[in-house]
A protein has these predicted regions:
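Catalytic-core domains of enzymes
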Residues: 1-107
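Caspase-like cysteine protease fold
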Residues: 4-6, 24, 28-30, 35-37, ...
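Catalytic cores of nucleophile-dependent amide-cleaving enzymes
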Residues: 35-42, 46, 108-198
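Residue-level detector of buried hydrophobic side-chain packing
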Residues: 3, 59, 81, 110, ...
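Flexible loop/turn segments at secondary-structure boundaries
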Residues: 2-5, 65-67, 97-99, 117-120, ...
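Stable alpha-helical elements in mature extracytoplasmic
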Residues: 74-77, 81, 96, 100, ...
Length: 281
């Protein structure tokens, strides 16, 4: 059962005697991976055609009074991502449960950088993700409504859950998928904040370039390995993030600045009118 949390990309394609994590022949050098909860869910996720471009919403909550560490690096990265993709940005107290529930219904890409937790037992009220005003647990997720195409959860253990016979991994992925979320980027363990921020920024860049979700994540991880020191090349730092669900590309929409077009078109139209009038005269 524990193998369900093992990313296939960390397996080796051949025997190796090296102890240097950077030089090991991981499968990620040859293949990209995405995961499915079940064949029926996969079929459901692929039935409805979605728009290629989608607006993004980014969440970065603060945690006053919740006995949690503030994720300062995540906040900086979240703001940079929001600026890059002209996304709606909810930070600190604005990144609350109500705002998240509303965003789920607006057919957007959602990036959430927060604290998450899970336990390998059946206490679903202890599995979930933190917002500025509280904790959204697994049972509560089943009661939400969603039109979300892609949910990026940059938080610990969001892909981890208890095992039930005949049901598999009872995780946030299962809950969000059941309410209509088409695909997710989730964490299989307690992830490192710095490496997660590097990976998600790079992942979104490749997603914008047109790669599928698993291809974009593969490229982000390979870039990370190329620039890592021997310690950070350990799979703990890069293999925890994985794609679950629909693997098709979806580009975060970058809003055009239409003001520049207006400033260009009006003088041009005026010049054309003046030129035609001059010719008539």
């Amino acid at each position: 059962a524990e193998l369900s949390n093992l990313p296939f990309e960390t397996l080796l394609s051949e025997n190796s005697k090296t102890n240097d994590f950077r030089k090991l022949p991981y499968l990620i050098h040859k293949y990209n991976f995405s995961y499915s909860l079940s064949s029926s869910i996969t079929k459901l996720n692929n039935t409805k055609r979605r728009k290629l471009f989608e607006r993004m919403t980014v969440f970065s909550p603060s945690f006053e009074g919740q006995n949690l560490t503030q994720l300062q690096l995540s906040k900086v990265t979240a703001k940079a991502i929001a600026n890059e993709f002209k996304a709606s940005f909810f930070e600190n107290k604005e990144a609350n449960l109500k705002a998240f529930k509303n965003a789920l219904q607006e057919n957007k890409i959602i990036s959430m950088f927060s604290h998450g937790q899970s336990f390998n037992d059946f206490e679903n009220n202890k599995k979930g993700i933190y917002f500025s005003d509280g904790f959204l647990n697994l049972n509560e997720i089943y009661n939400l409504k969603s039109n979300c195409d892609f949910l990026l959860l940059g938080a610990c253990e969001t892909g981890l859950g208890g095992k039930e016979r005949g049901e598999g991994n009872i995780s946030l992925a299962r809950a969000f998928s059941s309410i209509g979320v088409k695909s997710m980027l989730l964490a299989s363990w307690k992830i490192d904040e710095e490496s997660t921020m590097k990976l998600t920024e790079s992942f979104l860049k490749y997603l914008q370039e047109g790669y599928s979700k698993s291809e974009a994540l593969q490229k982000a991880k390979l870039d990370f390995l190329k620039t890592s020191n021997p310690r950070n090349a350990n799979p703990f730092y890069w293999a925890g993030l994985n794609i679950v669900g629909n693997n098709k590309n979806i580009k975060p929409h970058q809003t055009q600045n239409y003001l520049w077009w207006i400033l260009l078109i009006f003088p041009l139209a005026g010049w054309v009118w003046y030129y035609k009038r001059k010719r008539v005269n």
